[in-house]
A protein has these predicted regions:
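Bacterial Sec-dependent N-terminal signal peptides
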Residues: 1-40
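Short active-site neighborhood of thiol/selenol oxidoreductases, capturing the structured segment around
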Residues: 205-230, 246-247
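Thiol/disulfide oxidoreductase modules built on the thioredoxin-like
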Residues: 277-317
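Oxidative protein folding and maturation machinery
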Residues: 36-201
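Conserved beta-strand segments of alpha/beta enzyme cores
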Residues: 245, 268-270
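Structural microenvironment flanking redox-active thiols in thiol-disulfide oxidoreductases
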Residues: 227-263, 277-281
Length: 325
């Protein structure tokens, strides 16, 4: 661990193993160290009078952003300070009590909606800063390749931002819409059923597909990245297991285009399209981009939602090993 950050920003970041006590202690150490420098994130100094892990974690969450200068737009161009501090903040949230995490997010929202620039020429600064933090939030919580990817936490962020009394109507509407979609088909919930038409022009129900595990793969035949990802999935030995069925669905409305495309997917996969693109036009599933992947269990409960390829394969290895015993 670096004294000035719980982990470094990098593409292969892994979850730190801190307990709440270690988190609070680490933040105290970091705050003392950063007090002596000018280029690091200004972590809060935890009072010595706070002895329990819970009170120390609560203090860190409530005061994490107190010493950060939100009016300084140059900090948007210093990822070693701002992005590092934000990434560490995101990493802490699942490690503290949910109520404590909520207070931390609310404190950040209050700062973002109370930026004082002091100059008339800087009237756009608050919006620029909020947009910057919105981009960071999407990067760390919304990107399936991020080790901190968490749709539920992302939705909580957006809900809290939307609920701030200083949020504009446009901000509130946008954040509420995004949060509502992110909450659809979360891990642990039953995946919403839908109708699809298969390659034999037969109408089917997703829930009627009999399989120990279903890999639901939303794709577009004109999407190169979709074919690259499909090839990676097909190369996994686990997807050849009788315990796994792959259902590849075109979720958009141009079904005639889909019908004219020769399949490039494995013959063992079930393919189909959503009639009239109902999956997306009716917001049955929130598909921000394709490919979009869900792993479902036998009862069609969501096990994984848009996992990284590595997480998907590791999970399939465990599940197929158990299923085949």
């Amino acid at each position: 661990m670096d004294c000035c950050g719980i982990f470094h920003i990098r593409t292969d970041m892994s979850k730190s193993l801190f307990t709440v006590i270690a988190v609070a202690t680490a933040m105290l150490v970091c705050s003392n160290a950063t007090a002596q420098q000018t280029d690091g994130f200004p972590y809060p100094t935890v009072p010595d009078t706070l002895r329990t892990a819970e009170t120390r974690a609560l203090y860190v969450m409530e005061h994490y952003w107190d010493r950060f200068n939100f009016a300084d737009t140059t900090l948007m161009h210093r990822p070693e300070t701002t992005e590092q501090g934000f990434a560490n903040f995101i990493d802490l949230l699942p490690r503290v009590a949910p109520s404590t995490a909520t207070l931390g997010i609310k404190a950040l929202a209050d700062h973002l909606y109370n930026i004082k620039t002091g100059k008339k020429d800087d009237s756009k600064t608050p919006e620029l800063i909020r947009d910057y933090f919105a981009t960071l939030t999407e990067k760390y919580l919304g990107d399936s390749e991020s080790p901190l990817h968490n749709d539920l936490l992302y939705a909580q962020f957006l809900d809290i931002m939307a609920a701030n009394k200083f949020a504009s109507m446009a901000e509130r509407t946008r954040n509420e819409y995004m949060a509502r979609n992110l909450k659809k088909n979360l891990p642990g919930t039953t995946a919403t059923d839908f109708v699809y038409i298969d390659r034999k022009n037969q109408q089917r129900q997703m829930h009627n597909l009999k399989a120990k595990y279903t890999l639901l793969y939303f794709y577009d035949p004109d999407c190169d990245h979709c074919h690259e990802t499909a090839a990676q999935i097909a190369a996994m030995p686990e997807t050849s297991s009788p315990a796994i069925s792959v259902l590849a669905i075109y979720p958009y409305s141009d079904s005639e285009m889909w019908k004219t495309k020769k399949s490039r997917l494995p013959s063992t996969w079930t393919e189909g399209y959503s009639p009239d693109g109902q999956i997306t036009t009716d917001d049955i599933y929130y598909i921000k981009s394709v490919p979009s992947v869900y792993l479902l269990d036998e009862q069609k409960r969501v096990v994984l939602k848009n996992p990284s390829i590595t997480l998907l394969q590791n999970t399939l290895k465990k599940l197929t090993a158990t299923a085949e015993k």
